[in-house]
Amino acid sequence: MAAVTSIMRVQQVLQSAVDAALRPHGLTFARYEALVLLTFAKRGSLPMRVMGERLQLHPTSVTNIVDRLEADGLVKRLPHPTDRRTTLAEITEAGRERREAATKAVTDIDFGLRGLTERQTAQLTDLLAKVRKAVGDFED
């Protein structure tokens, strides 16, 4: 149980650091993740249903995230070209710029890993990957 407690506490500390880095950019972590997802989509847009699947969020949560991003001019909704039942969320140029600035802020954070050697960081990454695979978070 000590390992689980440590992992959960580290997650809280890291999440707090990420939230603090994103706050000046007017983003929450969930909104930032949505912008990142749309940035890497082939056309810069995805069906909102697919966003929910990839972000592992309830459709209502995706709607709320897109509502806020749209209100800030970072995303726009578009009708799907071939499926009238589907709405696409598309990142705007302002959204790309905000995502880029926010990513720089997040990557500049000292997550406490600078005190580890490269080997220790690799070991930690490998161990956490094994735990994630064991609980079904992802496959090889």
Which residue ranges define each predicted feature?
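Charged, amphipathic alpha-helical coiled-coil/dimerization segments
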Residues: 67-126
